[in-house]
Amino acid sequence: MNALELEQILNHKLNSQAISDYAPNGLQVEGKKDIKKIITGVTASQALIEYAVSQNADAILVHHGYFWKSENPCIRGMKGKRIKTLLVNDINLYGYHLPLDVHPELGNNARLAALLEIEDLQPLEQGTVSIPVYGTLKTPLTSDAFAARIEQVLKRKPLVCSDNAPHLIRTVGICTGGGQSYIDLAANQGVDAFISGEVSEQTIHSAREQGIHFFAAGHHATERYGIKALGEWLSQHYDLEVEFKDIDNPA
């Protein structure tokens, strides 16, 4: 498949042009024109790039790519090494950030919800696109039982704050990655619990004072599943070899 054709397919599937983001979505570093093998992963780290090189991949597809609005634009140091490795090996880099968070089928929120048996997802924000969502547990659970399910699914123990929250969790707000600031929106909606990847100092106060369960399950851990699902979708619909590589990150 042609590299630019792949970008068009991904842009269309994720409706990337409709979402305002703080990183470019699409082909970020151009390599060879013909793509047969793709490595997917959460972040375009040096370790992921070197793995792609070892597998003779033609492209890398990630959730966390490069060229964020707040980052130094100079191509030097760590970023210079990463980009040089891509260019020397003629590997394309595709990155999709918010479009992959919010996609109703393949998105990080949607995939995590499915794994945790949270159904009937609804937007928490007003407007055409909502980054956080909320839904209903298939079976109501205690905080301990829900934490155990998170640990079983994500293979990591979540940080839990359940002070002053209801005994049973029926409704859950979700925003994977660094979405902890949406806890107030979830509390205003009246949901019983909120799960994100990260936690801030003020998040715990928000949870305690508003009587909502809070679970922080890891930025990386909560965002494995969107990019994995996107790669699986590509391999099912196109003549492409796609492999998900998990470069573990405890954060």
UniProtKB/Swiss-Prot annotation:
Q: Is Metal-binding set as a keyword in this record?
A: yes
Record keywords, A-Z: Metal-binding
Q: Where does a divalent metal cation 1 bind?
A: 63, 101, 223
The protein's matches in InterPro entries, at most eight in alphabetical order, are given as: DUF34/NIF3, DUF34/NIF3_sf
Q: What molecular function terms (GO) are annotated for this protein?
A: metal ion binding
Residues annotated for a divalent metal cation 2 binding in this entry: 64, 219, 223
Entry-linked PANTHER family: GTP CYCLOHYDROLASE 1 TYPE 2 HOMOLOG (PTHR13799:SF14), NGG1 INTERACTING FACTOR 3 (PTHR13799)
Q: What is this protein called?
A: GTP cyclohydrolase 1 type 2 homolog
